[in-house]
Amino acid sequence: RLELMLVCAHPAIAPAIRTPLMLQTVLGVDADAIAHAFAVAPAAMAQRLVRAKRRIRVARIPFATPERADLAGRLPAVLEAVYGAYAIDWPGHGSPVDSLSGEALHLALVLTELLPDEPEVLGLAALVCLSESRRRARRLDDGTFVPLDEQDTRLWDRPLIDRGEALLQRAHGYGRAGRYQLEAAIQSAHCDRARNGRTDWHALRALHRGLVEIAPSLGAVVALAAVDGEIDGPQVGLAALEAIGDPSADAFQPYWATRAHLHARAGQPKAAAGAYSRAIDLTSDGGLRDYLTACRTQLPARRGP
């Protein structure tokens, strides 16, 4: 599969479509799910994928593993595809065996064997290990979503946490910080709660700020706003969300879920209810929808902003 993914990252293929192409043709992800992950209309994504496949045929791109010297230009798209596959399957609450997230974990670890001296490869593997370690705690028996700060840490997979921490330490040893290392460090900071029973929000803010600086994205900015709200109060977090100028935020579920949480903490039940409703409308996962609906139901019945 890695060989096919490297083919999809050929220089003749437009950079923006390389990762979606890998997700569909190599990892079997549905085009609609890919479109949702990239905040693109399904029809537009389908057209781009068709054009990319046509490009492979017309350009007669060989199905061969590139030389190591050529890997650097293709590696970022491969890493993004592996992480994208994991993120798309993240809501799953069954066994990781034979799942897309299980395949993503396998590919991430295989990459560390092929490229053991690439810090971002190590960082990606650490990120997937640390995220996957909490799988059992993310859902109740009925499938209802459990937010990170409410999870029972006794259900976390300690050996997988230890493996992720070891990979992250190896990555840090190269002294070249990158997106996946920072994202793994964020997950590591959350996993510290299993050891000391608390969340170091100030450490998380420093890491999130670093991530926004080197790999800005809508998700990264929303996550930083959430952390700001935890430290400085909900109004500060809401102001950070208001400052986001990306129009795609209107269709970004985490934006509305975060906004709802901050409005609720600020004592603004009316605004919170509206934001929860928008987040629910944008949620296809039943367990997460049930959780958000319960949060909306528990809001105090009073007037407010």
What is the predicted function of each stretch?
Residues 108, 115, 175, 208, ...:
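Alpha-helical junction/boundary sensor with strong preference for TPR arrays
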Residues 36-38:
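Alpha-helical residues within the helix-turn-helix
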Residues 1-16, 22-31, 40-209:
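Amphipathic helix-loop-helix modules that constitute alpha-helical solenoid scaffolds
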Residues 120, 183, 219-220, 254, ...:
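Start-of-helix register in tetratricopeptide repeats
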Residues 129, 188-192, 228-229, 263, ...:
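Residue at a conserved register position within TPR or TPR-like alpha-solenoid repeats
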Residues 98, 132, 195-198, 214, ...:
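Structural motif corresponding to the intra-repeat A-B loop/turn of tetratricopeptide repeats
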